[in-house]
Amino acid sequence: MQKRTTPPPPLDITALFPELAPLARRAVRLHPRRGLKPGPGESKVGGTFLWPANEPWPMCSVGHAQTEPRRKQDAELLRREAETWGPVNERYPSGKPMPEGQPHGAYVGVIQLRVADVPELGFPEGCDLFQLLWCPRDHDHEEYSYYGPECRVYWRQSSTISEVLKEQPVPAIFDPHYMPQVCQFIPERIQDYPDVFALPEELQYRIWNWEETEAAQGHVYGYPDAAPGMKIGENVDWIQDPWFPPCPSCRQEMEHLLTVASWEWDGGSFRWWRPLEEPPLAHGVPLQDGQDTNDDAGITLGDAGNIYLFVCRRCPGWPIAYTLQCS
């Protein structure tokens, strides 16, 4: 069985700041890795999802952020998608796209998780499968300052799916940065700490002052705090200011569900977060750069950013919200 192990930290941050100890929370680093071909019902990035054959595959009907030349491509997009959907529609009539060119393109499967692999995600009663799909083109939602792929979440009971949709459509036009490579997840349970901006202000300043001293020896709290990469856990690896959206139903603050990340570590944080089992760096890449297998999923969100998914478990249907942050 494959595994990934986060290296022991080079320093004990709680010895320096004891107030952090009670703030530690369990996190699951998902560690997507290429090389294997997980089946339709397995936890993974990309590939064929466990999607019911009698359920329409989602098609995007939301306007895309695009230049004028991209708008002119919509006619070609619809023609190519009609060709792609022709043989599929013969077998799966319920999966036909809407007429009159209303859908702009097919969604793609991004992340699928089984409760058996990551119960920490928290599943609705009677469900054992989580699926995240998105439209792999940019969407501009000015009302909440979002620019990126349009996301949808599905919760399922896998035992009720008797026939899987084998030919899952591929969009004719897409941003290649939003098309995931097929990866297997290798979940790892760790303990991490809140992002510095989620800490009390007085503690923030003490940490920043420590970072300026010789005793810090180049360490910064931003490396050992919230684990980066694709993860499940209460402590969020924020790139910008922390922001938990209000639930669209009850207006109360939602909780972090899942982070979809461009990178698992970078040239500064790899000493803390590059798993011990990773193979030697290839192509003579200097170790201090740390740029090797940290982006196996092949996703780039803005300037190497993250999409954060949030859920409200208080309201029926568990409403979902999401945002994208990048540097």
Q: Where are these predicted regions, by residue range?
A:
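Preference for intrinsically disordered or flexible, low-complexity segments
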Residues: M1-S327
